[in-house]
Curated annotation (Swiss-Prot):
Biological processes per GO annotation: flavonoid biosynthetic process; polyketide biosynthetic process
Thermal behavior of activity: Optimum temperature is 50 degrees Celsius.
Annotated protein name in UniProt: Curcumin synthase 1
Known tissue expression: Expressed in both the leaf and rhizome, with higher expression in the rhizome.
Catalyzed chemical reaction(s): (E)-feruloylacetyl-CoA + (E)-feruloyl-CoA + H2O = curcumin + CO2 + 2 CoA
GO molecular function: acyltransferase activity, transferring groups other than amino-acyl groups; curcumin synthase activity
Family of this protein: Belongs to the thiolase-like superfamily. Chalcone/stilbene synthases family.
InterPro entries associated with the record: Chalcone/stilbene_synt_C, Chalcone/stilbene_synt_N, Polyketide_synthase_type-III, Thiolase-like
Active site: C164
Subunit structure: Homodimer.
Length: 389
């Protein structure tokens, strides 16, 4: 038994998990929000629905999104017209696209992260990958590992159909992997392409219209590991703690169903209030052990589900406007990219901190929180410690 205890100690890292590199990627097709209603109603052959188009234009303006990147183009939609219907059975057409394109876009983000990390791909020991779409066997994790040329010994984990909170949740998983496997280097990748949720407009389906107005495509990747090699690996953040909380009796707040016509989503109008009203408890649980009880004393890397959610959090927790400014900026420039979004926010924060001459990667502060919100209702809270700049 003594030998077993010694072996277990030897298997563990000495220090905390750190985020060593960040990479992001989007499809090349940029859509300005101001002209998106014209594009959307044209490609879905819905220009006869002028009143609905006016309503959709107001919805697009209200999102506060300025532009988004999408895989779908007018050419692709002409080749696959079923995608433009409201609820015509079209799963096979959609699946044919995402099975190929999700790993490809993920590869772009992963390669950027690996390049910043500065070590050979052969030294990646674990791959954790999530996407709401593209369920297949072998999965997108296998396809990505093959595209990247990762070693056959890499330990893969694929997570499907989990949505917006999963970017934060994967950091919780990566922390445990890195700290319990000495020398582990975990490539964490989130990639979301909205092909399975794109569809034509319908007067009675507000949720579907809201999705067309706010969702974007993107991929984010990070490399996580403990005990960084001096002079080679340069941590950006330490992962001090990570935890999940499910809000009681909230399964109807937000979610989705996979059908023959793709993904259909639902959400309550009260969703921003539900998140804001319950977030304080999660923050208390995460930050109290550090002696932090003032939410303005930490930096924020929050998933911006929509503008109303950001507003509700800011008001309920009495945050100064700068705390969620990075989340607002990313949402404005990219829309809601579901699980990948939080990696864009984290990347933007560390870059902004450097450009503005802050003393740390966390806007000059030592401690911060990375937050994800998703179906469940699930609240993911990751405590980050910034690094000096």
């Amino acid at each position: 038994m003594a030998n077993l205890h010694a072996l277990r100690r030897e298997q563990r890292a000495q220090g905390p998990a750190t985020i060593m590199a960040i990479g992001t990627a989007t499809p090349p097709n940029l859509y300005e929000q101001s002209t998106f209603p014209d594009f959307y109603f044209r490609v879905t052959n819905s220009d006869d629905k002028q009143e609905l188009k006016k309503k959709f234009r107001r919805m697009c303006e209200k999102t506060m999104v300025k532009k988004r990147y999408l895989h779908l183009t007018e050419e692709i939609l002409k080749e696959r017209p079923k995608l433009c219907s409201y609820k015509e059975a079209s799963f096979d057409d959609r699946q044919d696209i995402v099975v190929e394109e999700i790993p490809r876009l993920a590869k772009e983000a992963a390669e950027k992260a690996i390049k910043e990390w500065g070590r050979p791909k052969s030294e990646i020991t674990h791959l954790v990958f999530c996407s709401i779409s593209g369920i297949d066997m072998p999965g997108a994790d296998y396809r990505l590992a093959t595209l990247l040329g990762l070693p056959l010994t890499v330990n893969r984990l694929m997570i499907y159909s989990q949505a917006c909170h999963m970017g934060a949740a994967m950091l919780r998983i990566a922390k445990d992997l890195a700290e319990n496997n000495r020398g582990a280097r975990v490539l964490v990748v989130a990639c979301e392409i909205t092909v399975l949720s794109f569809r034509g407009p319908n007067e009675g389906d507000f949720e579907a219209l809201a999705g067309q107005a706010g969702f974007g495509d993107g991929a984010g990747a990070v490399v996580v590991g403990a005990d960084p090699l001096e002079g080679i690996e340069k941590p950006i953040y330490e992962i001090a703690a990570a935890m999940q909380e499910t809000v009681a009796e909230s399964q109807g707040a937000v979610g989705g169903h996979l059908r023959a016509f793709g993904w259909t989503f639902y959400f309550l109008n009260q969703l921003p209030a539900i998140i804001a009203d319950n977030l304080g408890r999660s923050l208390e649980r995460a930050l109290a052990p550090l002696g932090v009880r003032e939410w303005n004393d930490v930096f924020w890397v929050a998933h911006p589900g929509n503008w109303a959610i950001i507003d509700a959090i800011e008001a309920k927790l009495q945050l100064s406007p700068d705390k969620l400014s990075t989340a607002r900026h990313v949402f404005t420039e990219y829309g809601n990219m579901q699980s990948a979004t939080v990696y864009f926010v984290m990347d933007e924060l560390r870059k902004r901190s450097a450009v503005e001459g802050r003393s740390t990667t966390g806007d000059g502060l030592q401690w911060g929180v990375l937050l994800g919100f998703g179906p469940g209702l699930s609240i993911e809270t990751v405590v980050l410690r910034s690094m000096p700049l």
